[in-house]
Amino acid sequence: MDKLTAMATFVKVVDAGSFTRAADALGLPKARVSQRVSDLEKHLGVRLLNRTTRALSLTHDGSAYFDKCQVLLQQIDELEATLRGGTATPIGRLRVDSLITIARWVIAPRLHDFQARYPRIQLRLSSSDRISNLLEDGIDCTIRGGALKDSSMIARHLCDIQMGLYASPEYLASIGGVDSPNDLSQFRRLSWFSGRERNPFMWELESGPERFVVQSGDGMQFDEPDVAISACMAGSGICPGAPFAVAGFVRAGKLVPVLPQWHFSAAPVHVIYPGSRHLSVRVRCFVNWVMELFAENPEIQLTPIALALESGLAQRT
């Protein structure tokens, strides 16, 4: 048995979702494709696929083996491309995890550019606000806020986000406005929780040298910031938000800055990937692309006060 051929056939079967489609893609009889996978299972001594008359699914062992096969086959492709042409052609799957707000408002709108540059990279983008373990979760690189805690990883700085507070015009009219941070505890507050510990987001505001902590209350909490913003626009209360994410709503009159001279501490955002001399070409291409994307988009660095001044909504100081 040619192990590399068997591994490549197994990966093709999983990608295609059936032996028939894999056989068509490979230009082989279905029986030969099925036999290759069976021989591989016999060689390994484990079942890789659950087979039914209607569908195929990976076993637990099969899932782990599939991930390793992909990495190995992609490394072989890159090595051969380097030897043939001097420069490795980025090819294969790339698994990226990102903060939800960054994924929605910064990365997704520009993915057509990444696809045009690297048409052979198959990007799988997941978005969440929990802390990912790259190795355990099978992720190639991640975009995260806050300080880097794992010294085995490399973090490249992308930007600093300074969040502010926002509310719908209708809600502000109903409460008569907000004149100082002391007023915030009287009104409905929307926030979110994230991370493995599901800790709530703390309202710790600053304005120059001044600091103010809004005491926790009974406001609603969400596990996605964008959902909280949607509730905010519907008049449910006052909500934190990244200026670049809410700028369109502010300019359209759907949201109004609240105390724009007060803001949350600037949070650094990094693209993080394993520290390895053998970093794949795919990861290197994505890291360079995303750093270029952030550098060319000044609105990502927009501050609450700048957005309010731009919109003519910075009356309350």
From Swiss-Prot:
<protein>
    <recommendedName>
        <fullName>HTH-type transcriptional repressor PA14_22550</fullName>
    </recommendedName>
</protein>
<keyword id="KW-0805">Transcription regulation</keyword>
<comment type="function">
    <text>Represses the transcription of the operon that consists of PA14_22510 to PA14_22540.</text>
</comment>
<keyword id="KW-0238">DNA-binding</keyword>
<dbReference type="GO" id="GO:0003700">
    <property type="term" value="F:DNA-binding transcription factor activity"/>
</dbReference>
<dbReference type="GO" id="GO:0043565">
    <property type="term" value="F:sequence-specific DNA binding"/>
</dbReference>
<comment type="similarity">
    <text>Belongs to the LysR transcriptional regulatory family.</text>
</comment>
<dbReference type="InterPro" id="IPR036388">
    <property type="entry name" value="WH-like_DNA-bd_sf"/>
</dbReference>
<dbReference type="Pfam" id="PF00126">
    <property type="entry name" value="HTH_1"/>
</dbReference>
<dbReference type="InterPro" id="IPR036390">
    <property type="entry name" value="WH_DNA-bd_sf"/>
</dbReference>
<feature type="DNA-binding region" description="H-T-H motif">
    <location>
        <begin position="19"/>
        <end position="38"/>
    </location>
</feature>
<keyword id="KW-0804">Transcription</keyword>
<feature type="domain" description="HTH lysR-type">
    <location>
        <begin position="1"/>
        <end position="59"/>
    </location>
</feature>
<keyword id="KW-0678">Repressor</keyword>
<dbReference type="GO" id="GO:0006351">
    <property type="term" value="P:DNA-templated transcription"/>
</dbReference>
<dbReference type="Pfam" id="PF03466">
    <property type="entry name" value="LysR_substrate"/>
</dbReference>
<dbReference type="InterPro" id="IPR000847">
    <property type="entry name" value="Tscrpt_reg_HTH_LysR"/>
</dbReference>
<dbReference type="InterPro" id="IPR005119">
    <property type="entry name" value="LysR_subst-bd"/>
</dbReference>
